[in-house]
Amino acid sequence: MFDAKQGSVSRRGFLGFAGVAAAGLAGATALSGCSPRTSGGKDSKSGEVAGISGVSGHEREGLPSFLIAPEPITDISETLDYDVVVVGADSAGIPAALSACEAGAKVALLQKESTAISQGNTASGIITDKSNPAAAAALAQLLVKESAYRADPALIQVWIDNGGEAVKWVLDKVAAAGGSVIDQGNNQQSKASNEVNGYEGLNYVTSYMGPKPYSNGDGMKVLAQVAEEAGVDIYYSTPAEQLVKNEDGAVSGVIAEGENGYMQFNAAKGVIIATGDYQNDEEMSNYYLPDLRYFGRKQSNKTGDGHKMIVWAGGKITNIVHTKMMHDFDAGPMWNVPFLAVKTASGKRFMNEKIDMAMVCNYLTSEADAGRYCQVFDSKYEQIVPEWKGVGKFVSAEDMRVYMPE
């Protein structure tokens, strides 16, 4: 999966590396991610739970409990040996497990839930042999810039070089197994994704698993079946609890809780962590993303398990300023049309309606607002909006009823 001699990731290996962290070399090192669990944290000196600081609503007093490693689990009821152990049956973990299996590895895939889980509908990558290398390089620099120069350029380059092949591989596998997926090519890409700093010529493969309510989650259930038929051993309802390290300090396995007690999965070649985010761990979320304290959560049971295990094994979660991922307006398909925007709580206009959609949440972080606002427009919008050339995407009243039935 990872070429330790060359220090590079192969294109097929990218499918495994995409799972967030490959923790089989010299121990886990760094992990970028999100965070949330109980209120307050533990003081690193006393071990007691520290209360909220009360300063600007931040929970930053003492060492958070999720960073404190628990006692090692020693009551092991069963030990199993594999080449590769993947934790998390999602859109990263399942392709990683299947790819490793096809490469000849004996693979175990551990999943906390009773089925595969994944969200969203699309994934994109650049078709490198049909794209302008200068445009690809410009896009890589743009992504670093748009991330306030906090992104890892090397990680972005992995996506630039390998993303297209990886997405196409998944798309083809799901389609061949009967999943509902198509390639939308460049249709979902904005102008900024196709023409960067004057450089043109980017071509994308864009998988779309849909239409809704069908999603990536349904596609991953199909791919999980493909993986099982290929020889991957999938352990559902088997949450990973701790990573195991060998005498040299390298991660060499995973301890998970099975139906009859704790199981140790030894991994001769490596462990891949693909456990998703931490939006449902309140302590982690309030620690790393205090802006989201009053926002609702779209998902459930996403408690940063992989982040914690990697930290307990000696790794590091990326510093604060994690992405909020507040980019989904399922109930408002014309979010990018500058209709009057008012707060739900007060009915008052609160912003310049040309603000980028992903930034709107920054105006709505209070307990009263909790991320809620309304767009106001009348029935004449069907005649007016099409005349606003270059502004938003027009949606007919008939199509709007699909989202907001009377």
Q: How would you name each of these model-derived features?
A:
Residues M1-G13, A21-A22, T29:
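N-terminal secretory signal peptides
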Residues S53, D161-Y262, E282-E283:
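Conserved redox-cofactor binding core of oxidoreductases
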Residues I76-D90:
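Beta1/beta-strand and adjacent pyrophosphate-binding region of the FAD-binding site
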Residues E113-A135:
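Conserved N-terminal glycine-rich FAD pyrophosphate-binding loop of Rossmann-like flavoproteins
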Residues I127-W159:
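Glycine-rich active-site loop/strand segments that organize a redox cofactor
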Residues G258, N266-F329:
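Glycine-rich loop(s) and the adjacent beta-strand/alpha-helix scaffold that form part
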Residues H307-M309, K316-E406:
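An anion/pyrophosphate-binding glycine-rich loop and adjacent beta-alpha core
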